[in-house]
């Protein structure tokens, strides 16, 4: 029931936040091809996240950063984010965003990923965005408002 309430609020919020999409898309377009750097930043900030990936657990981050396996996995993660960003701001496809987030959250929950790990991922990711894009108050607000809605869906499943 909690999930359905959150989902309803997020759908309603999507209509109210169409004005946020240009800021999210503009900043994302500046970093969406930095897949390896984004995942490297997350792993560097939170090694416990790296340890959740069996193919990278216990390995030297500097060494794996240059591997094809790291590049492929980084691209998977960033491509998912790109898909979400491409849909943001269009109320007609809000249910698609919600379904993608639900599937991702369920997949990660099945692997034992916690809300706390997602929060840490987000902290590192947002830090990367802020330091690698043209960042201002409107951009920060857009990411916060839309991000909070998306995180509510994910966290309702991970809790």
Swiss-Prot record:
Concerning its family, UniProt says: Belongs to the globin family.
Stated name of the protein = Globin CTT-W
| Domain annotation Globin: ranges | 17-159
The miscellaneous annotation reads: There are at least 12 different components in Midge globin.
Q: Where does this protein hold heme b?
A: 73, 108
- How is this protein annotated for GO cellular component? extracellular region; hemoglobin complex
Molecular functions (GO terms): heme binding; metal ion binding; oxygen binding; oxygen carrier activity
Keyword list (alphabetical) reads: Heme, Iron, Metal-binding, Oxygen transport, Signal, Transport
Q: InterPro entries attached here?
A: Erythrocruorin, Globin, Globin-like_sf, Globin/Proto, Mb-like_M
Q: What are the boundaries of the signal sequence? A: 1-16
Originating organism: Chironomus thummi piger (Midge)
């Amino acid at each position: 029931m909690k999930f359905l309430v959150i989902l309803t609020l997020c759908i309603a919020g999507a209509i109210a936040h169409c004005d946020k999409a240009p800021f999210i898309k503009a900043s994302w377009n500046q970093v969406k091809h930095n897949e390896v750097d984004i995942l490297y930043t997350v792993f560097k900030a939170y090694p416990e996240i790296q340890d959740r990936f069996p193919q990278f657990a216990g390995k030297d981050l500097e060494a794996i950063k240059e591997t094809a396996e790291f590049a492929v996995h980084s691209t998977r993660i960033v491509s998912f984010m790109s898909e979400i960003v491409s849909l943001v701001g269009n109320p007609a496809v809000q249910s698609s965003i919600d379904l993608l987030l639900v599937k991702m959250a369920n997949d990660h929950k099945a692997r034992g990923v916690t809300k706390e790990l997602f929060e840490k991922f987000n902290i590192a990711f947002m830090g990367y965005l802020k330091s690698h894009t043209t960042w201002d108050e409107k951009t920060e607000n857009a990411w916060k408002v839309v991000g909070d809605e998306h995180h509510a869906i994910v966290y309702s499943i991970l809790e």
